[in-house]
């Protein structure tokens, strides 16, 4: 066999071995692992929406959403070809799958994958890129606050009063980020810069819309936090489409 042919054969064998190892690992981790390995491109950041079901009739979906809210679920309705009722958003697939496997989401529940990053900043002038990168960090800060606070109340490790304090601190941080980016991008007429500014303003509005009243009880507070968290994820998905598209 010629040296070049032998090298080609070794290369093919190496690729085949890597592929078989990947298949074996995915099989070990579960069937979903194989799909995720090939559907999730390198560098993409996903969020996972736990949906309680889908409905052809939007009225039925909204009725189901109200029931979900009464139990602490987000009860967010995504209207499309079918209407999907979202119960909660998760940064980790394993966390979403764990809840799904637990059965508390219902027999018709499933996981919906949403792409929220990575969002590049190469569209920005060099002297603004660091500020843009910092501003994009609003998402993780707000998501973590809403997610962890909702779980804390649900687990009785946080009171609604505690939640108000945490949310207020989060809002102050995002407001500072908004102000810093506004100063850094002053004079820029780039539409993508404007989109990022709007994303920061929207995040602040979502925080302001969280209903944390002792009057309505902990389930309502948890539901409100999860509802705004789902909205945050969908807004980030839209921003990703603009800045990374």
Residue ranges and their predicted role:
Residues 190-245:
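Extracytoplasmic/luminal low-complexity segments enriched in Pro/Gly and acidic/polar residues
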Residues 1-10:
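Short, low-complexity patches enriched in S/T/P/G
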Residues 43-49, 149-152, 208-216:
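Acidic/histidine-rich, surface-exposed loop or edge segments in extracytoplasmic proteins
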Residues 127-206:
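Alpha-helical segments in soluble extracytoplasmic regions
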Residues 2-3, 25-41:
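Short, charge-rich amphipathic segments
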Residues 22, 33-34, 137-138:
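Short S/T/G/P-rich N-terminal loop/turn motif that feeds into the first structured element of a domain
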Residues 10-30:
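Hydrophobic membrane-insertion alpha-helices, especially the h-region
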Residues 33-128:
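Solvent-exposed beta-strand motifs enriched in subsets of small alpha/beta binding domains
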């Amino acid at each position: 066999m010629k040296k070049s042919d032998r090298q080609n054969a070794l290369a093919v064998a190496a690729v085949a071995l890597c592929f078989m190892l990947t298949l074996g690992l995915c099989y070990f981790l579960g069937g979903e692992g194989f799909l995720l390995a090939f559907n999730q491109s390198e560098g993409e950041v996903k969020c996972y929406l736990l949906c309680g079901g889908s409905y052809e009739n939007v009225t039925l979906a909204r009725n189901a959403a109200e029931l979900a809210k009464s139990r602490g679920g987000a009860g967010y309705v995504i209207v499309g070809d079918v209407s999907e009722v979202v119960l909660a958003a998760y940064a980790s697939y394993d966390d979403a799958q764990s809840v799904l496997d637990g059965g508390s989401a219902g027999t018709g529940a499933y996981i919906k994958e949403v792409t929220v990053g990575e969002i590049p900043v190469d569209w920005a002038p060099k002297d603004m890129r660091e500020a843009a990168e910092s501003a994009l960090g609003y998402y993780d800060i707000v998501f973590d606050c809403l997610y962890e606070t909702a779980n804390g109340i649900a687990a009785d490790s946080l009171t609604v009063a505690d939640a108000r304090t945490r949310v207020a601190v989060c809002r102050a941080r995002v407001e500072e980020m908004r102000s810093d980016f506004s100063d850094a991008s002053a004079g820029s007429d780039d539409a993508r810069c404007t989109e990022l500014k709007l994303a920061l303003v929207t995040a602040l509005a979502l925080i302001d819309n969280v209903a944390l009243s002792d009057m309505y009880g902990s389930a309502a507070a948890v539901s409100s936090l999860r509802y705004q968290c789902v909205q945050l994820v969908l807004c980030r998905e839209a921003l990703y489409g603009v800045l990374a598209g």
